[in-house]
């Protein structure tokens, strides 16, 4: 789903190909309801929205053909989500360094035009700012004179 910049309504995108093109160009060419007229006749900002949530974020490059991208939302943690890429071989790649290592070991993908710039491990922003727990340092307990007396009595 993507959100119209004019009316702020959510629109369902029928294919990953359309979705990836919109996602890649969203900053340069903001999405508007009229964009969907190619696959949804008579679409406009006057039509009720298709949904109420969105798992997109702008400027994510399109995924190379045959590859897939997966975003795993964590249940309340210090990190909101993890992004993984899966090449046609099915391996899981968790970082830019792993992508580069994979491409170094599989030059056939490089020959097909796959390069590191086609992968983004940027995660979406949580809709609830309090979803991600803030890291805090544990409070160190200071020894009191009572603790010292207990240790002396153990001798």
Curated annotation (Swiss-Prot):
Zn(2+) binds at residues 4, 7, 33, 45. Residues 53-126 form the MBD domain. Disulfide bonds: none annotated. It is found in: Nucleus. Transmembrane segments: none annotated. GO terms for molecular function: methyl-CpG binding; zinc ion binding. SUPFAM superfamilies: DNA-binding domain. Residues 145-155 have a biased composition (Basic and acidic residues). Residues 133-144 have a biased composition (Basic residues). Pfam families: MBD, zf-CW. A motif (MBD-associated domain (MAD)) lies at residues 3-45. Probable transcriptional regulator. The methyl-CpG-binding domain (MBD) functions both in binding to methylated DNA and in protein interactions. This is Putative methyl-CpG-binding domain protein 12. It comes from Arabidopsis thaliana.
């Amino acid at each position: 789903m993507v959100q119209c910049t004019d009316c702020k309504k959510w629109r369902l995108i029928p294919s990953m190909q359309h979705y990836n093109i919109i996602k890649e160009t969203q900053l340069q060419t903001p999405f508007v309801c009229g964009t969907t007229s190619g696959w949804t006749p008579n679409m406009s900002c006057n039509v009720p929205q298709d949904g109420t949530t969105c798992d997109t974020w702008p400027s994510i490059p399109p995924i190379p053909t045959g590859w897939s991208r997966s975003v795993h939302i964590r249940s309340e943690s210090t990190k909101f989500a993890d992004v993984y890429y899966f090449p046609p071989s099915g391996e899981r790649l968790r970082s830019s360094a792993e992508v580069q290592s994979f491409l170094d070991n599989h030059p056939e993908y490089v020959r097909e035009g796959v390069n590191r710039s086609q992968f983004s491990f940027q995660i979406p922003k949580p809709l609830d700012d309090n979803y991600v727990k803030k890291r805090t340092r544990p409070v160190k307990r200071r020894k009191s004179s009572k603790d010292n007396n207990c240790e002396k009595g153990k001798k």
